[in-house]
Amino acid sequence: MVTVTRSPQEFIDQLRRTQSDLLARLEPDATLRPDDPKLDLKTLLKAALRNEMEAVEIAARWIPRTGDAELKLALARQVGDEARHYRLIQERLRELGESLAGFNPLAQGYSPLFQYLDGLTDPIEQVAAGQFTREAIALVKNTQFIAHCVALGDQKTAA
């Protein structure tokens, strides 16, 4: 028998602290700055397309795996949100003169994070890992990307 010694709020607070400590490792700007000079803004935006497509696909894969109607609807909303993000990035690339003809964001396969998330079967794990942790990682990286765009003088992409 497992004895619960923490309240739900204490668990959430501990999860947030642990997550914050781990995500702090992503914060140095050097983690965003490309080592390869070929990784310019357009290349970084194409990498963002991959991230958005993976977010679309993982949420879509989880819909038929859950029996909870509310979770199905939340995942469906997430699919739509991530698809909208994909379209916004796609449009910005076109404005920058980048042709996406023949571009496949998943041509190099799925990321290790996607593969891990795809293996989760428990809805609680999916929500914790997919919704909270993945979005927290995205928040850190998006903040860095915005700062990078501002430093390049590209206010439109930063917006």
Identify the meaning behind each predicted range:
Residues M1-A159:
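Non-heme di-metal
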